[in-house]
Regions:
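Catalytic domains of riboflavin
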Residues: 13
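Extracellular beta-rich repeat passengers
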Residues: 1-3, 19-40, 44-46, 50-153, ...
Length: 438
């Protein structure tokens, strides 16, 4: 337990092993790292030297099994607002550890290039530990280039708070990949979900507190550039929105799965695919899902039992054309091969949504979590396990606003997939012999 006023600093490249016990319970709790309110963790790894939390067991140990639930996880608690009377609540998986407050800018530290594998031990029926739990964590906290793989319960779960996530992945977790609840109002961009055949949903997003579908603050995640990959044999919805959650979802690619997006148990929020209508409803009382969302390779319904019974105008628009991703599973339903980078001539580069203009979101010219570059390379579980498709030749995609001096070498491969604007004061230099494809 990192107590109030204490900072735990973890050096890049550090590996922390979790003790294994086949009989974890409430009386024999699984080991986990808990940052209490007012404490901080400074875990700043790099792509070449990530910080890794994993089980002490190796894959050839007879107790390793499918690699899930072998120890606890990482639990961070902050003072940011949550939807609960009194402003605080006890965190899931522990006894008597509180989260929540009134400071949306609360700072619990830094998680950068942090990998959490093999966690999620069950300590009681329906009481498991998530890979990374962010409970009442504020936006002053940095969470980027983080990964949860082979967790028994959820990958990332946010209970209220305002913390933002960028460049994060959840791989082969037993429950939901990104789970939000209790008034979470953070932002996320460049998020990847890779579901094994027995994983649950890519997102499960709730808001209801004490039976009230309109409890405040209403959960209202703003997520953009998200890729959710699974096989068509997967029986669960890719995204599940329910219990009064609002939100803003743009530039998504859903590849595979049975059904796409399900929404039920609305509160009084407006459900719409029209940004003007969402703006008129006002934050956080709308649920906006972009009509440019790519849903390809589904076995069932793109909008599964989608509840649109509000004052909003719901059109059920989506894009069916392939983004050029590929994914196979092995005999156990676990990832075997994976190509997360979309085709330059596919649907990922057509009808791209503008992201919200603020200090967090990065303007992109593609949908999904990846353009031509793969930010998983060099540090992810998927890369280390040899599951990522190796590109023979990197393609640089050109489009949007060029805001800094740029040099295009003749040795590169370039694809102009939209208008490219060289802005005032910027110089674009193109080497002799360069070929740019349109």
């Amino acid at each position: 337990f990192v107590k109030d006023g204490v900072t735990l600093t973890i050096e890049a490249g550090t590996e922390i092993l979790g003790r294994y016990d086949a009989n974890y319970s409430a009386d024999n709790p699984a080991p986990c790292l808990v940052v209490e309110q007012g404490g901080k963790v400074m875990a700043q790894g790099t792509a070449d030297a990530p910080i890794t939390f994993r089980s002490e067991l190796s894959e050839d140990d007879p107790n390793y099994g499918n690699g899930r639930g072998l120890w606890g996880g990482l639990i961070i608690n902050g003072y940011a607002p949550i939807a609960n009377e009194g402003g605080t609540a006890a965190v899931e998986g522990l006894t008597g550890v509180l989260y929540g407050g009134s400071d949306p800018d609360d700072n619990s530290g830094v998680l950068r290039y942090v990998r959490v594998w093999n966690g999620g031990s069950s300590i009681a029926p329906d009481n498991e530990i998530n890979g990374i739990t962010l409970a009442g964590v504020g936006r002053g906290t940095t969470v980027e280039y983080c990964e949860v793989a082979l967790n028994l319960d959820d990958g990332f779960e946010m209970f209220g708070g305002t913390v933002d996530l960028k460049y994060c992945s959840a791989v082969s977790v037993g429950d939901d990949a990104f789970d939000t609840d209790a008034g979470y109002q953070g932002r996320g961009q460049f998020l990847l979900v890779v579901r094994a055949d027995d994983s649950d949903k890519g997102h499960e997003m709730d808001s209801k507190t004490n039976g009230d579908l309109d409890s405040q603050p209403r959960s209202h995640p703003h997520f953009a550039n998200v890729t959710v990959i699974s096989s068509v044999a997967h029986g669960e919805d890719a995204l599940r929105l329910r219990e009064g959650t609002g939100g803003d979802f743009r530039n998504y690619i859903i590849h595979g799965a049975n059904d796409g997006v399900r929404n039920d148990d609305n509160g009084s929020e407006v459900v719409t695919q029209d940004l003007a209508e969402a703006a008129a409803a006002g934050h956080p009382d709308f649920l906006y899902v972009s009509g440019s969302m790519v849903m390809n390779g589904l076995g069932g319904d793109p909008w599964d039992d989608f509840d649109e019974a509000t004052d909003g105008t719901w059109t059920g628009t989506y894009v069916m054309e392939s983004a050029g991703l590929s994914y196979t599973v092995d005999a156990n339903g676990l990832p075997a091969t994976l190509d997360v980078t979309p085709s330059a001539d596919g649907s990922a580069y057509e009808g791209v949504d503008d992201v919200i203009e603020d200090d967090f979101f990065v303007p992109t010219y593609y949908k999904g979590a990846f353009g031509s570059a793969n930010w998983l390379e060099g540090w992810s579980y998927l890369d280390e396990a040899g599951l990522l498709f190796e590109q023979e030749e990197a393609v640089t995609l050109l489009g949007g606003n060029l805001t800094e001096d740029t040099y295009l070498a003749a040795s590169g491969t370039y694809y102009l997939n939209q208008q490219l604007f060289v802005k005032d004061g910027v110089t674009l230099t193109i080497e002799a012999g360069t070929e740019i494809l349109g």
